[in-house]
Amino acid sequence: MSRRAFSVAVFARNGGAVLLVHHRRLGTWLPVGGELEADETPLEAARRELLEETGLSGRFPAGLGVDGTPAGLIGYEEHLAGSKGLHMNFAFVADVPSRELAHCDEWSEARWVTGPEGLDCPENVRQLLVLALAAPSSSG
């Protein structure tokens, strides 16, 4: 398989709740995120996507993994995605200072949730949501 697509998902966290948005094109609840740009690291893409889709800057907690692991990284997943080939997604958690969101055309509704119960979203989003809620907070 020669084609690959790289993306990030950012679970923005504030006051014990995590932000999910209802994605217009995909029609389901997801964290904010998107594809990496040409010369971006996954963490740089996560910071950019969070700001673009919410207007918020986040603090990505350090020390969640092995030395060399990007701050805030809580998971990695891959799957085949049609013409894109292998889709590789890096999932992050970021502590944000507010629940006030800038409007974004990519989503139609936003919710701050405290758990996966009752959510109409993919199973991997439920699993990562639990990890995001349990991850240590950033230290400033």
Locate predicted features.
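Short connector loops at helix/strand junctions that flank enzyme active sites
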Residues: 5, 13, 31, 83-89
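Actinobacteria-biased recognition of intrinsically disordered, low-complexity terminal regions
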Residues: 137-140
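Short, solvent-exposed aromatic-acidic interface loops
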Residues: 24-26, 68, 108-111
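Conserved Nudix-box catalytic region and its N-terminal flanking loop in Nudix hydrolases
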Residues: 17-52, 56-59
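Conserved N-terminal beta-strand and adjoining loop/helix that marks the start
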Residues: 1-18, 35-38
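Active-site segment of metal-dependent pyrophosphate-handling enzymes
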Residues: 55-99
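NUDIX/MutT-family hydrolases
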Residues: 90-93, 100-134
